[in-house]
Amino acid sequence: MESRFKLKEEYHQSCCAIQVRVPVIKTSSTKRKNQLYTTGPFIMRSSSPSQPPSIKAQHRIAKHKAIRRRRIDLNCGCSIFYHIKCADHGFTHRGEHHCASGREFRFYLGGTKSPLFQDHAGGRSSIHTDKDIPHPNQVQSQPQESTGSPQSIPELPSLDDIDSSFWDDIFK
């Protein structure tokens, strides 16, 4: 078998290599060193790192396995394909959120089963509380707002109280 290519750079356990044209090299072996051995559905590559493994076997397997996808045609004219396993996840396209399932659609638009509009008994906690034991109020009161200046900053004079000679010196 004759080889007209040699590897310029090798990558350990990778299928990528840069090939350059060189003079013909005659090899004594007729078998390729990276021959694939198949045992049922599994493929075992040889451990020789001198040549990159062939990707043809992976492509052959991938052609037989059908990918289950669903197509969505959007109002903007774009088409999106999403995997069946991703059915409960929406996506955003050009700033607009799109729902990928009926359950998610109810969530965003507030259908009857939407968690946004469920009444959960006033937000009570699920922890058992004894009504005979007095509990302090756990909500901290906020200080009342005032229109005056804070205590740490002294009150500044009004800009109207500053005489015009001060402003004349600044804007000369």
Curated annotation (Swiss-Prot):
Residues 119-172 are annotated as: Disordered. Residues 158-172 are annotated as: Transactivation. One of its GO terms (molecular function) is zinc ion binding. GO terms for cellular component: host cell cytoplasm; host cell nucleus; viral capsid. Its main location: host cell. It comes from the Viruses. InterPro entries: Gemini_AL2. The zinc finger and the transactivation region are involved in PTGS suppression. Belongs to the geminiviridae transcriptional activator protein family. This is Transcriptional activator protein. It comes from Bean golden yellow mosaic virus (isolate Puerto Rico).
